[in-house]
Design a protein with these regions (language model features):
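Structural preference for solvent-exposed beta-strand-turn elements
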Residues: 1-433
């Protein structure tokens, strides 16, 4: 194992925690900045591996991107300013980069190939290939398995009205980004509203985009073709998916009080906070503000006695990445927690139904995997264990937090995988002990 990390139990976590910038917003700020006229300045950018993959791809297409300790400056070249890359575009481990870029690249007048690591190249890309092909894109899976590597040739795009079978922000975003270049208007309807960062940011960059929640609960985003986007200043809020680990740590660990600073609380992402409240958590939002359409706040968390809850339906897309952490909270809570409608977990960095179940069972929890989620009987004391992260950053972090309240030490294998989204995670965790 590359990097085993031993986590000892503790109590009394205290302090103020700065959360790294939101991953979704960081990716999109680079992409839109590159396609805009003028410069885009980005502060609190997430310098994790995934977002650096996005930067690398645009640099390969002739976009100058300056990195200083304070900010990132993207020198945009306008909607038609990208140039053909000399080599394969390396998307690393980043599904966001791959799926969103597929929409942008489909509209370019050059051929490109995107490829990533073994995990990325096994994740499903048919969900973007299908709608983009309907728009006139020439996009093929090199190995014929509907996965990356993806080869994209120039195509004349036309607008479509697409109904997505999944509430996936990445699918929606790929179509909307392609729609900027299409002949005619484009709409995407999804079964429930997924993350809407793309819509909010496109609007702030000057695109003509509208969003509606339909009477039946489905959500439609509608974009018109765009002449130009214009560079913006963006202060990226803290990533609630990263904040979730410290919120959970404050709730689960005895005698704790943490202030988690500058967290994005966009309603399409804040399902985790709703679940915490439903479980009886002592959570207070302070210093709420709004910038670039994205709300943010500091979150004050105190140790709480939690109880079980049911998580399903439209709530799922607002907390999909937090489910491993929620499962840990459920194991420490009194009563039963049921998670369903979350089959999407199977196609994340790992099959998170399986990896969460394995890790929780190894610590002595009572968890039953289901086809679209899991059932957790809480209230059993957990003990330290050897946890295989399977190189999944969310598993590594969720079980590092689980370890704090367990009986005995826990070893997390391959803990360096947290670098994908939260390189300072273990340092900050040690700092609040």
């Amino acid at each position: 194992y590359m990097s085993d990390r031993i986590i000892c139990p503790c109590k009394g976590l205290h302090g103020e925690i700065m959360i790294p910038g939101d991953k979704s917003i960081s990716h999109r700020s680079i992409m839109l900045g590159a396609l805009a006229l003028g410069t885009t300045e980005i502060t609190n950018f997430l310098e994790g591996a995934d977002c650096l993959s996005t930067i690398g791809c645009f640099q390969s297409m002739g976009i100058q991107i300056d990195r200083t300790p304070e900010k990132i400056i993207v020198h945009g070249k306008g909607m038609h300013g990208l140039s053909a890359p000399k080599d394969i575009l390396n998307v690393g481990n980043s599904g966001t980069t791959t799926r969103l870029m597929s929409g942008i690249l489909s509209a370019q007048d050059f051929t490109s190939v995107m490829s990533g690591d073994a995990s990325l190249n096994s994740r499903p890309m048919g969900r973007v290939i299908t709608p983009l092909t309907q728009m006139g894109a020439h996009i093929t899976s090199v190995n014929g398995d509907l996965c990356a590597p993806l080869k994209i040739k120039p195509g004349m795009l036309h607008g479509i009205d697409y109904t997505s079978p999944v509430a996936s922000a990445q699918v929606k975003s790929a179509i909307l980004l392609a729609g900027l270049y299409a002949d005619g208007e484009t709409s995407v309807t999804e079964p429930a509203l997924s993350r809407n960062h793309t819509e909010l940011m496109l609007k702030s960059f000057g695109a003509d985009i509208t969003s509606t929640i339909n009477p039946d609960g489905t959500a439609t985003a509608h974009v018109k073709p765009c002449q130009e986007l214009y560079g913006q200043s963006i202060c990226v809020p803290g990533d609630i998916s990263s904040a979730a680990y410290f919120i959970a740590a404050g709730l689960l660990t005895l005698d704790s009080e943490l202030l988690v600073k500058n967290v994005g609380i966009n309603k399409t992402r804040a399902g985790f906070l709703e679940v915490c409240r439903n479980m009886g958590a002592d959570i207070t939002l302070v210093n709420e503000s709004l910038e670039g359409g994205e709300p943010r706040a500091d979150i004050l968390v105190r140790t709480s006695k939690l109880h079980g809850t049911t998580i399903e339906g439209a709530l799922i897309p607002t907390l999909i990445d937090e489910i491993p952490m929620i499962a840990v909270m459920a194991a420490y809570a009194e009563g039963t927690t049921i998670i369903k409608d979350a089959a999407e977990l199977k196609v994340k960095e790992t099959n998170r139904i399986d990896t969460t179940t394995e890790a929780l069972r190894s610590m002595g929890a009572d968890i039953t995997p289901t086809d679209d989620g899991m059932i957790i009987q809480g209230g059993h004391a957990l003990h330290g264990a050897k946890i295989n992260s399977y190189l999944d950053h969310r598993i590594a972090m969720a079980f590092a937090i689980a370890a704090l309240s367990a009986d005995g030490d826990t070893i997390i294998h391959d803990s360096q995988c947290v670098d994908v989204s939260y390189p300072e995670f273990f340092e900050i965790l040690d700092g609040c002990r």
